[in-house]
Structure formats: C-alpha cells, structure tokens
C-alpha cells in the first residue's frame, strides 16, 4: 500500500516539530522543505529525525530539501512558513510580510501538488488561508487553516488546570477568528459530560476565555525569542492524521464559509468533518444570541483583516 506523502513547508520550530509528530505516528513519508538560503538546514533536521527512528521505533522516510520538486504529488501540505511573532507583536503585525511569503508558497504548491490538501498555519491565520485559497485556486474544501484545534486545546488545558481534572474529560469548542475575537461556545463545553457552566462561574469562565485568547502571546512573552511550537505542531499532526486516515474527525478548523453561518465567502473557524478530501462538511450549530453576536463580531474582524491584506498586496 502506498504511503501518504506529507510535506511541511518551513523547517523552523513548528515545521520541524510537526515533521517529528507525523513521522513518529507513522502517518506517512515526510518532506521537510525550507527556502534555499537555509542551505542544508532542512536536510540536517530530516537526517536527525531519521536517526531517531530506530530508537523510538517508527518507520517513516524523512527528506529535507530546498527544492519544491521533491514535494511533487504530496497528499497533504502543512504550511508553516513565515516570520514568527516576537514579544509585543500581534499576529496582525506579520500581515504584509507573511502574505507575500504565502503567495510564493501557494504558487509553488499549485505547480507541484495540484491534488494536495493544504493546512495553513502561518499567521495571521485567517488572512493567510484566504490568500492561499485565492492564489492556488484549489477547491475550498482542500484549503484549510489550523487554528481551532490549537485554541480549543489551550482552552481545555486551562479548564482542566482550573478544575483539577484530566484534560481528556474536557470537551470544548471555540469558533471564529484566530485571535482576540475567538468565540467560546459554552453550550458545547462540558467536563465528563457535565455542562461547564455548572462547575465554573461565568466570571471565572470569562477570565479563562481571555487567557485562551492571549494564549499565544503569553508563550511569546515567556520565550522572548520565539513563539509556541509544540502545541501548534501537535494540532497540525492531528489534522494530518484525520486526512491521511480518512478519520472523519469533528474538529474546529478555519474553513471556507459561504452560505454557512451567513459568512459570505471567507475563512473562519467552525466545526467540520475532516477526512481524506479535506473539509467534508461544515457543521452548523444553533448558537445563542450572545454567541451569535460574538461570532459575527469575529467574522467582521476577519473581513477587515483580509481587506487590509488585499490593500497591502496591491501597493
């Protein structure tokens, strides 16, 4: 049986860690790509990972390269390329530079792997995945953004820490943009099947939501020289697994919404069924009035971000 071919674009912390997770889980063979000026760096990381395989007991081929020809006919491509956040920066501060990087990557993917499912990780996420979709011209189901899995994982972690319970017993959902306007859905949040609102006061829940919104910035401020990578890479690997194994996972991703939720042609975080074809369907929830208002506010922020990006690229 043919192994899946998984390409990671960007061999920095997120990309290399994602390659590690994917290889260790034997999700397929991995190509780790970076720009030519990095010279042999991706090859070095790939070789290091390969040498871990006999110790950790996984059997995946891992190749490092600076040539998109080596990525040809990939099944899944994870795009982590772009400048990372530094202390004091918002995700939006990266907009102009990373939009140009993502445009270049999109053109290469279109030429070499026209049938791939693309997972965009580069920030600001909601604008970058929109740009990837625009430049590749791929069907919208095959271009998705990694945001909701990570945001929900952070939310679940903080809830578990607050309650002193296992993270495995926390079920939660966050929607909307990847940033300060992300929307918690309390009606879809439970602890061992118990509604979270029965266990935590609204005031304390609001504080946990606020920490979740600032979760990436908190890590940036602690690291000082970089941004989060273990959890973002793990989130990517979970999405890759859902695709290559056709698992039909119900998870939140940045998906192209047209009529869904009345969004009107933008990428925004919503729950989907994720399988071999990418987004197989978007799940539309009945939100409360408060949740609906917060979600629309988040969508408006995404639209404004995309409009700003389009203006910068047109200059």
Swiss-Prot record:
<feature type="binding site">
    <location>
        <position position="85"/>
    </location>
    <ligand>
        <name>substrate</name>
    </ligand>
</feature>
<dbReference type="InterPro" id="IPR001557">
    <property type="entry name" value="L-lactate/malate_DH"/>
</dbReference>
<keyword id="KW-0816">Tricarboxylic acid cycle</keyword>
<feature type="binding site">
    <location>
        <position position="154"/>
    </location>
    <ligand>
        <name>substrate</name>
    </ligand>
</feature>
<feature type="binding site">
    <location>
        <begin position="121"/>
        <end position="123"/>
    </location>
    <ligand>
        <name>NAD(+)</name>
    </ligand>
</feature>
<dbReference type="GO" id="GO:0019752">
    <property type="term" value="P:carboxylic acid metabolic process"/>
</dbReference>
<feature type="binding site">
    <location>
        <position position="98"/>
    </location>
    <ligand>
        <name>NAD(+)</name>
    </ligand>
</feature>
<keyword id="KW-0520">NAD</keyword>
<dbReference type="GO" id="GO:0005737">
    <property type="term" value="C:cytoplasm"/>
</dbReference>
<keyword id="KW-0560">Oxidoreductase</keyword>
<dbReference type="GO" id="GO:0006099">
    <property type="term" value="P:tricarboxylic acid cycle"/>
</dbReference>
<dbReference type="InterPro" id="IPR001236">
    <property type="entry name" value="Lactate/malate_DH_N"/>
</dbReference>
<dbReference type="InterPro" id="IPR022383">
    <property type="entry name" value="Lactate/malate_DH_C"/>
</dbReference>
<comment type="similarity">
    <text>Belongs to the LDH/MDH superfamily. MDH type 3 family.</text>
</comment>
<dbReference type="InterPro" id="IPR036291">
    <property type="entry name" value="NAD(P)-bd_dom_sf"/>
</dbReference>
<dbReference type="Pfam" id="PF02866">
    <property type="entry name" value="Ldh_1_C"/>
</dbReference>
<feature type="binding site">
    <location>
        <position position="91"/>
    </location>
    <ligand>
        <name>substrate</name>
    </ligand>
</feature>
<dbReference type="Pfam" id="PF00056">
    <property type="entry name" value="Ldh_1_N"/>
</dbReference>
<dbReference type="GO" id="GO:0030060">
    <property type="term" value="F:L-malate dehydrogenase (NAD+) activity"/>
</dbReference>
<dbReference type="InterPro" id="IPR015955">
    <property type="entry name" value="Lactate_DH/Glyco_Ohase_4_C"/>
</dbReference>
<feature type="active site" description="Proton acceptor">
    <location>
        <position position="178"/>
    </location>
</feature>
<protein>
    <recommendedName>
        <fullName>Malate dehydrogenase</fullName>
        <ecNumber>1.1.1.37</ecNumber>
    </recommendedName>
</protein>
<feature type="binding site">
    <location>
        <position position="34"/>
    </location>
    <ligand>
        <name>NAD(+)</name>
    </ligand>
</feature>
<comment type="function">
    <text>Catalyzes the reversible oxidation of malate to oxaloacetate.</text>
</comment>
<dbReference type="InterPro" id="IPR011275">
    <property type="entry name" value="Malate_DH_type3"/>
</dbReference>
<feature type="binding site">
    <location>
        <position position="123"/>
    </location>
    <ligand>
        <name>substrate</name>
    </ligand>
</feature>
<feature type="binding site">
    <location>
        <begin position="10"/>
        <end position="15"/>
    </location>
    <ligand>
        <name>NAD(+)</name>
    </ligand>
</feature>
């Amino acid at each position: 049986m043919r192994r899946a071919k998984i390409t990671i674009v960007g061999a920095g912390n997120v990309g290399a860690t994602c390659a590690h997770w994917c290889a260790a889980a034997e999700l397929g063979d991995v190509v780790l790509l970076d720009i030519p000026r990095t010279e042999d760096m991706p090859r070095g990381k790939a070789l290091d990972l390969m040498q871990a395989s006999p110790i950790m007991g996984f059997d995946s081929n891992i190749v490092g390269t600076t040539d998109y020809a080596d990525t040809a006919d990939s099944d899944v491509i994870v795009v982590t390329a772009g400048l990372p956040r530094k202390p004091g920066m918002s995700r939006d501060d990266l907009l102009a530079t990373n939009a140009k990087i993502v445009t270049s990557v999109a053109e290469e993917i279109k030429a070499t792997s026209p049938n791939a499912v693309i997972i965009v990780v580069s920030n600001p996420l909601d604008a970058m995945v929109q740009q990837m979709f625009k430049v590749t011209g791929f069907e919208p189901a095959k271009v998705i953004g990694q945001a909701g899995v990570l945001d929900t994982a952070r939310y679940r972690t903080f809830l578990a820490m607050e309650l002193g319970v296992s993270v495995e017993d926390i079920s939660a959902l966050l929607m909307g943009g990847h940033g300060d306007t992300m929307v918690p859905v309390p009606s879809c949040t439970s602890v061992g099947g118990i509604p979270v609102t029965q266990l935590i006061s609204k005031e304390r829940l609001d504080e946990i939501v606020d920490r979740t919104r600032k979760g990436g910035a908190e890590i940036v401020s602690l690291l000082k020289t970089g941004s989060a990578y273990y959890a973002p890479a793990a989130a990517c690997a979970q999405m890759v697994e859902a695709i290559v194994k056709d698992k039909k996972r119900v998870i939140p991703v940045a998906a192209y919404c047209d009529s869904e939720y009345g969004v009107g042609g933008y990428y925004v975080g919503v729950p989907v069924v994720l399988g071999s074809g990418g987004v197989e369907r978007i799940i539309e929830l009945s939100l409360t009035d408060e949740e609906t208002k917060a979600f629309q506010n988040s969508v408006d922020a995404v639209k404004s971000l995309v409009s700003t990006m389009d203006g910068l690229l047109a200059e």
